[in-house]
């Protein structure tokens, strides 16, 4: 129902689940219990370790159904798919050139 009764005592951020609050608290404590066995880099969340480990293995489990290009992160696939649908919702206020991703616009804007 939108209730968020679990409140972080450090920053006041509210959560609807106690486990999410516990995970959030690691930001304040600096706790990083998940360690990469390859390089020793540490992470707050297991999911972040799993994604990081792909840099060592080269695994790219997310494949574009349009062109077959593969990505290590789902978010990178989603960004890539904009190339195929042609959507360009970010426009440069200086010259009007349009881009599919905010990051591309930011990079372009530096030339002005």
Swiss-Prot record:
Q: Which SMART domains match?
A: ZnF_C2H2
Enumerate the residue ranges forming zinc fingers (C2H2-type): 6-28, 34-56, 62-84, 90-112
Gene Ontology molecular function: any one: RNA polymerase II cis-regulatory region sequence-specific DNA binding
Which keywords does this chain's UniProt record carry?
DNA-binding, Metal-binding, Nucleus, Repeat, Transcription, Transcription regulation, Zinc, Zinc-finger
Source species, domain of life? Eukaryota
Check the record and name the PROSITE patterns matching this protein: ZINC_FINGER_C2H2_1, ZINC_FINGER_C2H2_2
Q: Which SUPFAM superfamilies match?
A: beta-beta-alpha zinc fingers
Q: Which InterPro entries match?
A: Znf_C2H2_sf (IPR036236), Znf_C2H2_type (IPR013087)
Q: Has the keyword NADP been applied to this entry?
A: no
GO cellular component terms, alphabetically, are: nucleus
- Is the Metal-binding keyword given for this protein? yes
Which compartment or compartments is the protein found in? Nucleus
Q: Name one Pfam family in it.
A: zf-C2H2
Which family is annotated? Belongs to the krueppel C2H2-type zinc-finger protein family.
Tell me, in a sentence or two, what this protein's role is. Answer: May be involved in transcriptional regulation.
What is this protein's record name? Gastrula zinc finger protein XlCGF9.1
Q: What is the lineage of its organism?
A: Eukaryota, Metazoa, Chordata, Craniata, Vertebrata
